[in-house]
Regions:
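Canonical positions in the second alpha-helix
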Residues: 34, 68, 102, 136, ...
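Short coil turns that delineate tetratricopeptide repeat
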Residues: 39, 73, 107, 141, ...
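TPR-adjacent "capping" and linker segments in tetratricopeptide-repeat scaffold/adaptor proteins
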Residues: 1-11
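TPR/TPR-like (Sel1-like) alpha-helical repeat modules
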Residues: 386, 400-422
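Conserved alpha-helical positions within TPR/SEL1-like repeat arrays
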Residues: 12-20, 43-54, 77-88, 111-122, ...
Length: 422
């Protein structure tokens, strides 16, 4: 063996040792020396690429994998590694092509099938992802990660019971697999098995103190109407991640249910600040303003109530301007407008009331257009058309009056029909 080969072998050994110790910058130095000594060494390019990938230098890693493949176009690991780098850059279709090639060259590598499944999963091609996870498990029946990933794909297809079986297997193979406990908790939550879900979230938190597990445990407690406990979990989620917009939103919901409206509004405003394009917070603040208006109406504080109702409308308008395809916010705005219309009717401002009721109808029709099973919107339409018939009885023809009454009854019947399905 000549001096050059001895030096190459030494740099390879040092590079492997550095890689094992996760000293990736040193890895790059060692394999760069190999490449300087032998620029046709495909393994050196591949290994340097791996180090760069671990440093999240994905584009540079791809350049090294390209070179490795150029030197050896049957280098299955280089295709696989390049696929991983492209996956991390969210170039999923390109990643799949590399995984395809890696599998063509070596179809016995369970990890490649798993990772190709991950790319298909992220493209929402869940059925295809499951096929890849199936193959990964066929090749390695103890592959806990593949069971977990297959469970996630089934969960996205709303196959919750099947997903749980996969999570069970993942946990059987690795009883410290925090993600599998967390994911199983989510499936049990979706099956409304809230107490069981909490047990899984407890285990996930014990193993990995994650903000998501606290947030989702809070959701389960919320649905059990244990609002104070839910708030404690949301507090912890926010402590771990103070930019967790959904945790603020969920905490706001719990506080709203405890009638702690000012605190709830503060949380909803924070969720809006963090996610300005998410309209859920706008809808909830509008709803709270409407609830507060109802309280003021009972106290006969009409001006204050009207002010709150108009503030609510402003929030709904902001939300709709951001996202115009959400049925709930149209329904909410219609409900609040109905309150204002009733206010005008009770003051005998009939023309104003009629104009407002017609705006309400537009909102409820839009809510139904976006969700044709929106029972509350149908019920509200019936309520308004019945009012319009009554307050206009002396101004419209008998035919128009009867038509409004008929439409009102049809809307009530439709609402009842939909509610009976629940």
């Amino acid at each position: 063996m000549n001096d050059k080969n001895i030096k190459i072998d030494r740099e390879f050994d040092l590079g492997y040792q550095a890689y094992q110790n996760k000293k990736y910058k040193e890895v790059i130095k060692h394999f760069s020396k190999v490449i300087k000594l032998d620029n046709n060494n495909s393994a050196a390019y591949n290994n340097r690429g791996l180090a760069k990938e671990n440093l999240q230098q994905y584009e540079e890693a791809i350049e090294d994998y390209d070179k490795a493949i150029e030197l050896d176009n049957d280098y299955s690991n280089a295709y696989y590694n390049r696929g991983n780098a492209k996956y991390n850059l969210q170039r999923y279709e390109e990643a799949i092509k590399d995984y395809d090639k890696a599998i063509e060259l070596d179809n016995n590598n369970s990890i490649v099938y798993n990772n190709r499944g991950n790319a298909k999963y992220d493209l929402e091609r869940y059925e295809e992802a499951i096929e890849d996870y199936d193959k990964a498990i066929e090749l390695d029946s103890n592959y806990s990660v593949a069971y977990n990933n297959r469970g996630l794909a089934k969960w996205n297809l709303q196959q919750y019971k099947e997903a749980i079986k996969d999570y069970d297997k993942a946990i059987e193979l690795d009883n410290n697999y925090s993600d599998a406990y967390y994911n199983r908790g989510n499936s049990k939550y979706d099956l409304e098995r809230y107490e069981e879900a909490i047990e899984d979230f407890n285990k996930a938190i014990e193993l990995d103190n994650s903000s998501d597990a606290y947030n989702n445990r809070g959701l389960a407690k919320y649905d059990l109407q244990r609002y104070e406990e839910a708030i404690e979990d949301y507090n912890k989620a926010i402590e771990l991640d103070n930019n967790y917009s959904m945790a603020y939103y969920n905490r706001g919901l719990a506080k709203k249910n405890l009638q702690r409206y000012k605190e709830a509004i503060k949380d909803f405003n924070k969720s809006i600040e963090l996610e300005p394009n998410d309209i859920l917070g706008y809808n909830q603040i509008g709803f709270i303003k409407t609830k507060q208006a109802n309280i003021e109406l009972k106290k006969l504080n009409y001006d204050k109530a009207l002010g709150l109702l108009n503030e609510a409308i402003e929030y709904y308008d902001k939300g709709i301007k951001i996202k115009s395809d959400n049925s709930e916010i149209y329904d909410s705005r219609g409900y609040t407008r109905t309150k204002i219309a009733n206010f005008e009717r009770d003051k005998n401002n009939i023309d104003n009331a009629i104009k407002l009721y017609k705006e309400c109808i537009e909102d409820f029709n839009k809510a139904i257009e976006l969700n044709n099973e929106h029972a509350l919107a149908y019920n509200s339409l019936g309520y308004i058309k019945n009012i319009l018939a009554n307050i206009q009885k002396d101004k419209i023809s008998e035919e128009d009056y009867n038509q409004l009454k008929k439409e009102a009854l049809d809307n009530f019947n439709k609402a009842y029909e939909l509610l009976m399905k629940i």
